[in-house]
């Protein structure tokens, strides 16, 4: 393929996953396979193809290290029913798209086990934190993880029945085997292959991911879905994650000190 594609031709990547074995993102796999740097833009976000085909309002993200290329993709694909935001945070966009598929399987398992809405909310919240921990370790920006390709895609994939990954989880929770499920599906559920790669990546960077790791263990047949949920519920109780809030009374703090304090907090949150 590298002999056919011009080195200056931009490539558009729509894949959401990590390479099995290497745990590489597609933006890393493509230049490695081509044995050269290639202009690349990643297109990702909360999208079901059937709704795009129906012309329903949709928002996605075009991410490229080359900001001009991201804007070019934005101008090519943006329309009255498709809003395209741009980003230079390729890592954040790709990692969100890959990890949310694994979390969607977990959400489906909770649905299949009929554990209720409280459990669903708690699990997805924990999963969002785990995505933030690992993606942040790799350099993803917090605003990307909170945007369309992060929170937006998580909400769509975890809570809507059209999601293939959620469907796999739901059927696993209902008692079907993975072989039965995959054998009856005409489409690919990316989270199945990605789960193991996520665990491998987490180990490499020493990040604890209880929920996403549990999904990988369930898919590998190492643990029953109900037992996995019980194990997660019996993890040590921990403080809730919170954001620092500053209350400033008029004339109590010099402006320069306030600016310095805010900068310190922002730097701390990025560490």
Model-derived segments and their meaning:
Residues 100, 107-111, 136-146, 150-250:
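NAD(P)-dependent Rossmann-like dehydrogenase/reductase catalytic/cofactor-binding core
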Residues 4, 29-39, 57-144:
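Internal alpha-helical scaffold of NAD(P)-dependent oxidoreductase catalytic cores
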Residues 13, 38-44, 84-88, 147, ...:
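General beta-strand structural signal in soluble alpha/beta enzymes
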Residues 1-55, 73-75:
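Rossmann-like NAD(P)(H) cofactor-binding subdomain of soluble oxidoreductases
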